[in-house]
């Protein structure tokens, strides 16, 4: 089994490209991770996701702990076997979903007590329990438990939240079972305050995680402020370890973040947009529901090799989406995931060639 490692092959200014080696294979960076929240990327077969060029998926601890439960998944051979995906899987800690989905929740030093959004059952999620669940799932990359600081937050509110995340990170690290080829990432917080981001990074670097995520962005602060944070936050992190920007997935945001030193991304945007009839193309977004596509016999993109573009017209996709056929969601999602992986491939090629990004989609 391979050791977990991050090898930077090319660098242009702050942008890096390379390979992350894991127990479940290699992943190219910069990487975009399709979101498989409940053990599936919606409207896609696992092998179809792989065909788009994805090297890694994201799973969600909160949803999987509720249904079908981590204990059931481990009895069935782990998440990789359960969902028939043999490449790396990163699982988030569940903290963000607890904060955003659970109406009845209480944050204490111990963790977060909450009621399930499904049936109202009461649960307690702690750094130790979150780490245990991810271990049972067999996650390649485990995320430390954190509090995602809401935006806007005052300096004092952000400081209190960041310090709690640091204490939880320490407990998450102590609970993590180290195995060859597996990793745990810490999450730095601090909202939009440079002093807090620097302190958070300093505290977490001392815990020697295998990689680091920048959390608490893309929560309403806007691109300008997000980029302002990214102008300095990655520089507080080790050069030789992966940097993951959580929940960011607009093409222009990805390109801007890579140019500031980010290596990994995840977002529901391509899959959710696909199911809602929106396609990403290098010429901009296409709302396939628009009546102007009803008689359009051309593909979404002439040079895209996904099945939606190879085999079907915009008129057919328009028809499927307008009548709510499942195939419409499948084809639109396949196209969008292909677009995002092609974008990452193009980004990696530009870094290899030492070229500035002259595109934003």
Swiss-Prot record:
One of its GO terms (molecular function) is tRNA-guanosine(34) queuine transglycosylase activity. Binds 1 zinc ion per subunit. One of its GO terms (cellular component) is cytoplasm. Pathway: tRNA modification; tRNA-queuosine biosynthesis. GO terms for biological process: queuosine biosynthetic process; tRNA wobble guanine modification; tRNA-guanine transglycosylation. Zn(2+) binds at residues 304, 306, 309, 335. The active site is at 92 (proton acceptor), 266 (nucleophile). Residues 247-253, 271-275 are annotated as: RNA binding. Its EC number is 2.4.2.29. Homodimer. Within each dimer, one monomer is responsible for RNA recognition and catalysis, while the other monomer binds to the replacement base PreQ1. NCBIfam families: Q_tRNA_tgt, tgt_general. This is Queuine tRNA-ribosyltransferase.
